[in-house]
């Protein structure tokens, strides 16, 4: 087998490495560093698929390895980050362990993705990287002391309720668009619109001199909201 065929799996392994290191730093209470590693893992997660397409290096092993890496980086890591933040905030009872549901439902979501032929172009349910990045950016903002809006509606309750909502979205049948661009303006219109939302959010955050983590938080909040709105409209028009 040519060396180039191993490039996607090597990048996937870097994704896994970032996830493992993120878990270690979370145990040490270094949540900001853990978030940086989550971002690095998400970059690797994008690049391994891109490399596989460019090099035509798809393999069954690569597909399974990608899911295993994603479970650590985007399932286990965000669960532990929220758990650690709750413990640091004085929540030491049952509620501190609610976030582990993200890891469990991420595993279910990844297993479903691997056997579901309907998700070759778009997703059914919230992608694990989107879930993880939403959680990670929230934790980072809290850890760096840049929370606003009354502690983001009381950070503690958000970090208990959000995992339950996200877990439901992970295994839902709600169609969610991917960011794979293809030929044809009709196919790419929604993706370009979403990129416009990201750009507008970035400009607003930078203009208001708000911490950069809010760009990520707003981006994935917008992604979830936009897909939910699309699903509601689809249900409404299907009944007519």
PLM regions: where:
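C-terminal membrane-associated helical module and adjoining short loops/tails
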Residues: 124-240
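Topogenic membrane-insertion module of multi-pass membrane proteins
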Residues: 1-46, 200, 205, 210-211, ...
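Helix-coil boundary and interhelical linker segments in multi-pass alpha-helical membrane proteins
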Residues: 21-36, 76-97, 138-158, 206-213
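"…together with the soluble PPM/PP2C metallo-phosphatase catalytic core" -> "…together
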Residues: 3-11, 18-27, 31, 36, ...
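Multi-pass membrane catalytic core of lipid/isoprenoid biosynthesis enzymes
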Residues: 8-12, 54-113
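Short, amphipathic, aromatic/basic-enriched membrane-interface segments that mark the entry/exit
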Residues: 1-10, 61-67, 179-190
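Membrane-interface helix caps and helix-loop-helix hairpins in membrane proteins
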Residues: 56-60, 88-90, 114-121, 149-152, ...
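Short hydrophobic alpha-helical membrane-embedded segments
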Residues: 9-16, 72-73, 186-198
């Amino acid at each position: 087998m040519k060396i180039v065929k191993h490039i996607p799996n090597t990048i996937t392994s870097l994704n896994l490495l970032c996830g493992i290191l993120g878990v270690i730093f979370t145990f040490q209470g270094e949540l900001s560093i853990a978030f940086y590693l989550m971002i690095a893992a998400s970059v690797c997660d994008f690049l391994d698929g891109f490399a596989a397409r460019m090099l035509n290096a798809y393999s069954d092993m690569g597909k399974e390895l990608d899911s295993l890496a994603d479970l650590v980086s985007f399932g286990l890591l965000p669960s532990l980050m929220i758990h650690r933040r709750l413990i640091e905030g004085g929540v030491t009872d049952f509620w501190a362990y609610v976030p582990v549901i993200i890891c469990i439902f991420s595993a279910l979501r990844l297993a479903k993705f691997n056997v579901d032929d309907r998700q070759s172009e778009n997703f059914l349910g919230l992608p694990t990287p989107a879930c993880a990045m939403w959680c990670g950016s929230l934790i980072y903002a809290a850890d760096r002391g840049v929370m606003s809006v009354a502690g983001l509606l009381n950070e503690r309750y958000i970090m208990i309720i959000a995992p339950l909502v996200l877990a439901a979205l992970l295994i839902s049948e709600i169609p969610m668009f991917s960011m794979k661009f293809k030929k044809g303006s009709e196919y790419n219109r929604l993706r370009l619109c979403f990129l416009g939302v990201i750009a507008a959010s970035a400009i607003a955050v930078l203009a208001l001199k708000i911490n950069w983590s809010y760009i990520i938080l707003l981006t994935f909040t917008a992604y979830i909201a936009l897909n939910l709105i699309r699903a509601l409209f689809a249900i409404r028009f299907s009944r007519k």
